[in-house]
């Protein structure tokens, strides 16, 4: 363990928060999920970021500051260039005539302290602040993207230059747009031609937000720049093109998948950001409760059978499969996947890209995989009867098969497989677990406020029995919402989490499958067996202040 990790571990053990066994679990989680020890502690909800920060500050003998609750003068923020502040994880937050207070992730960094003392001609008083708090403070002071781009354009207009795709301003505009999208944890960038302008939008937490409007004359040049970076044809404007690029950020090399499509007013580009720093998921931080975690862990440790992840497009199906694959990825196992596309690389796994031009389909690829001595197989999606049949046969003959289906709930996956000409007895014999999910936006921690909701309001959305079971007997309840702040773009939400229903195929459910009973009957039996429905999991997350009633209703309206 690193020195800081050892310090954190000792603090948690000495304070009685964890025992040696839990320390081993945290170390294993950090290793499997690619998290730092600090982040693994936070992920397991052992302590909050703020509490752990206070403990570390007290242990190291430095005062602790919460920047989110501190009014920082603009002039102090601008003492340090933003890139430097991000790299060093420092921010000045207060000063008087003789001294300056400096929030630092590493207050022992004498070099930084001396540099600030020399620059400001003041005594530097170092404070400890968490990485997350410093990052959010820097975001609060970040210049608006529109202002930055307008300034870049104004500089060139003053030079009376006509801009081409490889001119510095166009290059800088593309770079700064990607940098802002990455920092905002956007999944996609949309660059859309309009009649008189070019509109840029970021998809953040599943929803699109307008972020920038440019003169129409720049649109083609920006598209051309993206084509150059993606190695696409710059002279082709009437056909769709797909490509990819790699951009180096301060934190990682960022893979970006690019789609160019001709539309009415020009060419539209969509850039999918495949950021590994935002993909350090664990089953718990995806939103699975302890009860469901137990069921998932039981199934993924079986040598054979099938695990299905179901839900509409964009509901997080592939994310949970990737997370499971990372957990079971050991050298003694041969993990082989066939995907369309391969979005994220899994070290040690053999990942195959579907290619219809060479007749490499899900079905043909799956047949070939079975001759490669696999232990674990991931099929990106079951789209047809042939793939369904081969996948079930693979699960029946000693392989653990993970795959996805488009269904609204867990139980509906069973009749869907039967509709794909898989015999009911084969479905009953092979399917171990079905995970259905949706993604809800999480309430922003920076602007969370309490909210009173009456029983009569809740009863409009949830069965009374479910309310009493999960919340107890009361006429009103205290939930939470986000007021809206700069960190969350005034939406009240920041980040997403899953709401789940995890259906374990018990002996009773196997019997219902062989009898070809409908999804509703299977769901009722699964609930008897202890399954928490998706809407019930949503209610639990509302009660715990994770998300809001509006969010749960938005994504589970089919069920409600």
What positions do the PLM features span?
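N-terminal "pre-motor" subdomain/linker immediately upstream of P-loop NTPase catalytic cores
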Residues: 62, 72-74, 82-315, 320, ...
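Residue-level signature of catalytic and energy-coupling elements of molecular machines
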Residues: 12, 41, 102, 116, ...
């Amino acid at each position: 363990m690193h020195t800081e990790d050892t310090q954190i571990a000792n603090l948690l053990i000495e304070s009685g928060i964890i025992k040696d066994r839990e320390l081993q679990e945290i170390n294993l989680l950090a290793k499997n999920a690619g998290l730092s020890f600090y982040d693994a502690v936070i992920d397991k909800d052992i302590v909050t970021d703020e509490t752990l920060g206070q403990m570390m500050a007290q242990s190291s003998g430095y005062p602790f500051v919460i920047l989110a609750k501190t009014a920082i003068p603009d002039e102090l923020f601008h003492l340090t260039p933003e890139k430097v502040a991000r790299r060093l994880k420092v921010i000045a937050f207060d000063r008087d005539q003789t001294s300056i207070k400096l929030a630092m992730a590493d207050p022992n960094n004498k070099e930084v302290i001396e540099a600030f003392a020399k620059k400001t001609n003041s005594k530097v008083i170092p404070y400890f602040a968490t990485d997350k708090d410093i990052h959010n403070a820097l975001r609060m002071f970040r210049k608006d993207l529109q202002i930055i781009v307008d300034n870049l354009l104004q500089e060139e207009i003053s030079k009376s230059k006509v801009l081409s795709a490889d001119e510095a301003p166009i290059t800088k505009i593309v770079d700064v747009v990607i940098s802002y999208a990455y920092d905002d944890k956007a999944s996609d960038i949309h660059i859309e031609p309009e009649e008189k302008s070019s509109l840029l939008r970021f998809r953040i937490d599943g929803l699109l937000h307008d972020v920038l409007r440019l003169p129409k004359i720049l649109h083609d040049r920006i598209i051309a720049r993206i084509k150059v970076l993606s190695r696409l044809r710059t002279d082709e404007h009437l056909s769709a093109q797909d490509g990819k690029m790699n951009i180096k950020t301060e934190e990682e090399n960022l893979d970006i998948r690019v789609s160019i499509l001709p539309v009415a007013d020009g060419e539209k580009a969509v850039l999918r950001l495949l950021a590994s720093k935002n993909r350090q998921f664990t089953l718990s931080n995806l939103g699975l409760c302890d009860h469901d975690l137990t069921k998932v862990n039981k199934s993924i440790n079986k040598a054979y059978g099938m695990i299905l992840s179901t839900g509409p497009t964009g509901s997080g199906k592939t994310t949970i499969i990737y997370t499971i694959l990372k957990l079971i990825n050991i050298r003694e196992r041969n993990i082989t996947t066939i995907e369309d596309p391969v979005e994220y690389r899994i070290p040690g796994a053999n990942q195959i890209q579907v290619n219809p031009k060479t007749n490499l389909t899900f079905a043909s690829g799956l047949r070939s995989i079975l001759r490669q001595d696999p232990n674990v197989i991931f099929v990106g999606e079951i789209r047809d009867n042939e793939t369904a049949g081969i996948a079930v046969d693979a699960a029946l003959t000693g392989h653990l098969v993970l795959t996805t289906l488009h269904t609204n709930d867990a139980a509906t996956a069973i009749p869907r497989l039967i509709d794909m000409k898989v015999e009911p007895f084969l479905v009953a014999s092979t399917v171990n677990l079905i995970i259905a999910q949706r993604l809800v936006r999480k309430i922003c921690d920076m602007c969370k406020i309490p909210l009173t909701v009456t029983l009569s309001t809740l009863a409009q959305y949830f069965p009374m029995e479910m309310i009493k079971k999960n919340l107890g007997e009361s006429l009103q309840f205290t939930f939470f919402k986000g007021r809206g702040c700069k960190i969350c773009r005034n939406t009240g939400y920041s980040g997403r989490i899953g709401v789940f229903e995890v259906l374990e195929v018990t002996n009773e459910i196997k019997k219902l499958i062989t009898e070809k009973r409908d999804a509703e009957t299977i769901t009722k039996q699964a609930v008897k067996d202890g399954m928490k429905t998706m809407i019930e999991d949503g209610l639990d997350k509302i009660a715990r202040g994770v998300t809001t009633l509006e969010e749960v209703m938005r994504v589970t309206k089919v069920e409600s």
